């Protein structure tokens, strides 16, 4: 937990960001890949989440390449559908994509050439906490423990 004056932040999840590739992709069975090896692959960007877009751009910059989206979509459901149809590759939060991987239509690969994690925090803006706020924080902990 982090605290600054009256603002308190609690980490809900620390999650690996992977590269998601469709079944049949040349690296699908590799386990890990360098972003530079995928520089020419069409990239499916998730534009509906500003924070995930910032994380994505940081990951590509860390690997020394620019992110060029061939397709932009605003929902995870559409992004995963396009990916499983073989339309490109995507950055994926490992927990959120676990079910697709179990179905076999998508493979998650560790990224070798960049720091690839995301952290989600909940901030409490004052020390005053209602029963509803505590219940909501407990709900978030349960939710993120299932995907993390």
Task: State what each model feature region is.
Residues 18-20, 26, 44, 89, ...:
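Residues embedded in well-ordered beta-strands
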Residues 27, 42-63, 129-137, 147:
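Secondary-structure junction motif
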Residues 15, 30, 40-41, 63, ...:
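Structured helix-beta-strand junction loops
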Residues 7-23, 31-39, 111-119:
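Short Pro/Gly-enriched coil loops immediately N-terminal to beta-strands
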Residues 1-21, 58, 84-87, 107-109:
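Short beta-strand-centered segments that line the small-molecule binding cleft or hinge
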Residues 107-148:
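A late-sequence structural motif
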Residues 1-2, 23, 93-96, 120:
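Short secondary-structure boundary segments
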Residues 49-107:
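Hydrophobic hinge/microswitch elements
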């Amino acid at each position: 937990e982090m605290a600054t004056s009256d603002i308190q932040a609690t980490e809900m999840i620390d999650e690996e960001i992977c590269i998601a590739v469709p079944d049949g992709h040349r690296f699908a069975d590799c386990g890990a890949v360098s972003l530079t090896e995928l520089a020419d692959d069409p990239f499916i960007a998730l534009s509906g989440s500003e924070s995930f877009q910032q994380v994505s751009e940081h990951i590509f910059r860390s690997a020394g390449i620019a992110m060029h989206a061939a397709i932009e979509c605003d929902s995870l459901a559409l992004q995963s559908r396009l990916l499983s149809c073989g339309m490109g590759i995507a950055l994926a939060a490992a927990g959120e994509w676990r079910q697709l991987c179990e179905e076999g239509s998508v493979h998650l690969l560790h990224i070798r050439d960049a720091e690839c994690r995301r952290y989600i925090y909940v901030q409490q803006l004052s020390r005053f906490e209602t029963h509803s706020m505590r219940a909501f924080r407990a709900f978030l902990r349960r939710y993120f423990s299932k995907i993390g």
